[in-house]
Amino acid sequence: MQVLVPTATHGECDMAAKKTIFVAFAMKDERARDFLKGQSLNTNSPFEYIDMSVKEAYDAEWKSRVRTRIRRSDGVLALVSKNSLESSGQKWEIGCAKEEKKPLRGIFAYRDDRTNLSGVSTMIWNWDSIKKWIDDL
C-alpha cells in the first residue's frame, strides 16, 4: 500500500509537493491497514490514500513490483504486530526498504500489542506522530 502525503510548508499543505509512503503490513493485519486507509480518507486528515497493494504470491515478479514501489517512495511505514514476526512478505518489504536505504518507521498496529520488530523503530499510532515523521522526511 502507498499513501501520498501533502508536505507541510510553514504550517500549510503544499498540494503540489507530495510525499509517497509505502506501507508494509502482514496480510493478517489487513483490518489495521483498512483502518489506516479509513483515517487517511478523513477530510480532516492531511493524508491522501492511494491503494497500491500487491496480493500476488511472493515470487520474483511480486518482489520486482514491490521494490519498484519502495524505490519510488520517500519512506516506508510498517504496521507492527505479532503477525509481523511470521509475515514473510512484510519481512521482505522491510528488508527491501533497508537495502534501498529508505527511511523506515513502524507504528504499533494494535493498542495491546507492543511487538518488538528487530531493526524497526516503532511508535504509537496517532496522526501527530505519523505526520511529524513524514514531515521530517
Task: Identify the residue ranges that each predicted region occupies.
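Conserved N-terminal substructure of TIR/SEFIR domains
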Residues: 2-72, 102, 108-109
